[in-house]
């Protein structure tokens, strides 16, 4: 099976280096188990849709054509929340499935004073259930229950009070694209360089421009 995502990686090769945008936004191909790039610490808001369980995580490495020996999903989400704590944004959102919802809420409560979660869906199908956990140091409870995750990301990028949003699993760039549309900075990392190339292409298609540094 070939996961080339429309060959965007040939037009926007980002397997090495950092893509820096004219507004200071930055994207890099990166494995979460490696030390976090410094630029990720500039974020005051975070939204990430990380792998939801061990098999999901393994498929991310397979699609990225990277051989990895993952002992447990616990190892991954522990590292994920280490990164969230290090970024130390005012507010953070994490998308997750039912299997690890309780663990994500517990981890979020270790970092943030106010934690809530929303019932959500993905791919705009009511049968595709997921959850979005929100942690913040300020009390605020946006009415996001029942919204599709794509619409939640759109709402977050449009309505939260922030200067720069981080995504630790940028994928094909929903967070970056919505931040850019709202004239906000974004920083992001992604394991799969071919998926991150799709993000670059999407941003260029709406007027973004970058250099490699």
Residue ranges and their predicted role:
Residues 1-213:
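Class I S-adenosyl-L-methionine-dependent methyltransferase catalytic core
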């Amino acid at each position: 099976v070939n996961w080339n995502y429309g060959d965007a990686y040939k037009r926007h090769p980002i397997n090495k280096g950092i893509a820096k945008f004219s507004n200071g936004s930055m994207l890099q191909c990166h494995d979460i188990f490696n030390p976090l790039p410094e630029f990720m610490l500039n974020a005051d808001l975070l939204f990430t849709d990380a792998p939801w369980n061990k098999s999901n995580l393994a498929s991310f490495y397979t699609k990225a054509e990277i051989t990895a020996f993952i002992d447990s999903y616990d190892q991954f989400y522990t590292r994920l929340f280490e990164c969230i704590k290090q970024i130390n944004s005012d507010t953070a959102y994490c998308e997750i499935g039912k299997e690890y919802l309780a663990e994500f809420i517990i981890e979020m409560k270790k970092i943030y004073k106010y934690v809530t979660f929303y019932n959500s869906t993905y791919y705009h199908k009511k049968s595709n259930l997921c959850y979005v956990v929100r942690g913040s140091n300020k009390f605020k409870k946006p009415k996001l229950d029942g919204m599709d995750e794509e619409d939640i990301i759109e709402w977050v990028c449009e309505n939260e009070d922030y200067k720069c949003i981080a995504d630790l699993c940028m994928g094909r760039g929903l967070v970056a694209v919505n931040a850019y549309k709202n004239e906000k900075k974004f920083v992001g990392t992604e394991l799969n360089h071919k998926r991150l190339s799709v993000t670059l292409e999407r941003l260029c298609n709406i007027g973004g421009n970058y250099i490699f540094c």
